[in-house]
Design a protein with these regions (language model features):
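Core AdoMet radical
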Residues: 55-72, 79-101, 116-129, 145-171, ...
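Structural recognition of alpha->loop->beta junctions
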Residues: 49, 111-117, 204-219, 288-303
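Acidic (Asp/Glu)-rich catalytic clusters
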Residues: 79-81, 108-115, 135-145, 177-181
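Conserved C-terminal portion of the radical SAM core fold
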Residues: 170-229, 245-268
């Protein structure tokens, strides 16, 4: 059953933030610009993250402006039936600041040629930004909403090493400081249920994030995809996944630790069904969001509660249910 009522959404919703910021529904269009990662090509490691599906992938830095325009045009056309009027171009696949600076600029420049595009989001790693990259990205803040999305996953270096991330928590802190100095919005990706992490470790990662000057977060569920190192570990019985109920309760716990100014961009896994091994329940995105909202109501919980904030302090909570994030 879908949660209804003014108190249904007890967190700062990214959808609501965008609606208030732009006055209409805003849709993210994902772009694959053909990048790779430094823990795949040997710069810091090989093989990529142990949870990442590498099958059939080959970097393609020959993707240029024309292909970016085509992807954006297709995305805008596909979103029209949903009545989205404005769009954020999201460079999502792999590490989208890992390339020559002039190549990066030529790709980012293309998104602003679409009048419907009001923002740019760039997915990257904390070890793949420097002052030159930050200066380039900061230049676009005059044109619209600009986000750098950092894959952190965990604040514990031993976990980062175990999943072959190839960077440290300190490198993440350095990247946040550098990014914040130029006024670029920061979104952080975390994963609940990583091997070797208990509840306290999962919560500690988010306690640390709550003290940082970040603007958004994506909370992912660890899931197992085909053709990954973790798929082999899972088959060997070396990985225990969170149950649906455990994941829901952990998300509610995490939300209580985050201040209301951090908008929640995602609270679920994002796995292609054809490569997903487990858990199959993570495909039920809208149902999981409903479960989280029910759990918040049952526990009389809301974002920031553990920090002393009240429901009235949530700037982007919904007075009616939002579309799934």
């Amino acid at each position: 059953m879908t949660v209804r009522g003014d108190s249904a959404i007890r967190y700062s919703s990214f959808n609501r933030y965008l609606q208030r910021r732009f006055g209409c529904r805003v849709h993210k269009i994902t772009i694959d610009a053909g990048f790779t990662c430094p823990n795949r090509d040997g710069k810091v490691a090989r093989g990529g993250c142990t949870f990442c599906n590498n099958a059939g992938f080959s970097p393609n830095l020959r993707i240029g402006a024309a292909e970016i325009r085509q992807q954006l045009a297709r995305g805008i056309a596909a979103a029209r039936p949903g009545k989205a009027r404005k769009f954020i171009a999201y460079f999502q696949a792999y590490t989208n600041t890992y390339g020559p600076l002039d190549h990066l600029g030529s790709l980012y420049d293309e998104v602003w040629k679409f009048p419907e595009v009001v923002g740019l989001a760039i997915g990257t790693r904390p070890d793949c930004v420097d002052q030159r990259v930050i200066d380039l990205v900061a230049g676009y803040t005059r044109r619209g909403e600009v986000w750098l999305e950092y894959g952190l996953q965990s604040a514990f270096d031993r976990t980062l090493e175990a999943v072959n991330r190839g960077h440290t928590y300190q490198q993440f802190l350095d990247a946040v400081a550098l990014t914040r100095s130029r006024g670029i919005k920061i979104c952080v990706h975390t994963i609940l249920g990583l091997p070797g992490e208990d509840r306290d470790m999962m919560l500690e990662t988010h306690r640390r994030l709550a003290r940082l000057p970040i603007d958004g977060i994506k909370i992912h569920l660890l899931h197992i995809m085909r053709d990954t190192v973790m798929a082999r570990q899972y088959a060997a019985g070396q990985i225990n996944l969170l149950s649906r109920e455990e994941f829901v309760e952990r998300v509610v716990d995490v939300l209580e630790l985050l201040p209301p100014n951090i908008v929640i961009q995602r609270m679920h896994a994002d796995a292609p069904p054809d490569v997903l091994i487990a858990p199959q329940w993570c495909l039920d995105k809208s149902g999981i969001l409903d479960d989280i909202r029910h759990a918040q109501l049952r526990r009389d919980s809301w974002q920031g509660k553990a920090l002393g904030f009240t429901l009235a302090d949530l700037p982007y909570a919904h007075s009616s249910p939002a579309a799934p994030m």
